[in-house]
């Protein structure tokens, strides 16, 4: 048996604050309650209460087969692109490409007393793949930068944080239009030579990235740092 997680949805039932991980079965047969190895988590887990969904209806299932899509309760351990398997030879499916956001904003909660709800909410929404969140290099979660493909996603973020987590936010638009993932594993961010319109950031997995306001800055940064490999797409 093998499967990969392609979608996560939080608060499908607001009364229970549930979180469902949707996975596609790639091979073998699934049985409710079976134990599988979560490759990215590095441990064996039990998949209980599997469901299939049609619109707002949920149906508990006992078996599923290759090609089927099932939803399982996620206590916060899954991420998009995760592999689950019963194979003795551990492997991982290639991650799902992450499209480069084109709009960026610094996000803060209006009520400082709701910091915990804010961090929880924005992390859960990011784990669904609806937005991407970043931190400035060498800072903590105090400064959060959100990246989206379309500006309407900022409105969706505002609504969901307010409606689902009771958190009001303030957005400060940033001038950056381009983002690049750094492929080099041994890059020294402190000594990376860039341009005045470049910002060093990191994602939730502490992977280094660069933001640019102008396209020419990307080429100049590559020229100033021989061997630097920049990618327009990341992987979940």
Question: Where are the model-predicted features located?
Answer:
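Intrinsically disordered or highly flexible coil/loop and linker segments, enriched in small
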Residues: 14-15, 131-132, 170, 218
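Conserved structured catalytic cores and adjacent interaction surfaces
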Residues: 64, 105, 132-188, 197
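A common structural junction motif
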Residues: 41-44, 88-93, 125-130, 161-170
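Structural alpha-beta junctions
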Residues: 166, 235-236
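Conserved nucleotide-binding/hydrolysis modules and their immediate coupling elements
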Residues: 1-105, 119-120, 138-139, 143-145, ...
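Short amphipathic alpha-helix segments
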Residues: 113-127
């Amino acid at each position: 048996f093998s499967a990969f997680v392609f979608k996560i949805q939080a608060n499908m039932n607001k009364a229970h604050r549930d979180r469902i991980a949707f996975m596609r079965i790639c091979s073998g047969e699934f049985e409710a309650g079976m134990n599988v190895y979560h490759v990215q988590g590095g441990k064996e887990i039990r998949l209980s209460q599997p469901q299939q969904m049609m619109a707002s209806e949920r149906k508990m299932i006992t078996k599923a087969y290759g090609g089927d899509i099932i939803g399982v309760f996620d206590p916060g351990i899954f991420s998009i692109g995760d592999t689950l398997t019963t194979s003795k030879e551990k492997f991982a499916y290639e991650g799902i490409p992450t499209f480069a956001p084109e709009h960026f904003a610094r996000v803060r909660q209006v009520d400082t007393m709701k910091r915990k709800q804010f961090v929880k909410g924005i992390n859960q929404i990011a784990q669904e793949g609806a937005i991407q969140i970043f931190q400035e290099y060498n800072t903590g979660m105090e400064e959060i930068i959100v990246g989206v493909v379309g500006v309407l996603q900022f409105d969706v973020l505002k609504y969901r944080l307010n409606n689902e987590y009771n958190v009001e936010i303030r957005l400060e638009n940033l001038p950056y239009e381009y983002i690049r993932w750094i492929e080099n594993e041994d890059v020294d961010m402190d000594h990376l030579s860039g341009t005045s319109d470049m910002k060093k950031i990191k994602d939730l997995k502490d992977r280094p990235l660069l933001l640019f306001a102008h396209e020419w800055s990307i080429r100049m940064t590559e020229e100033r740092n021989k061997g630097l490999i920049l990618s327009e797409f990341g992987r979940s």
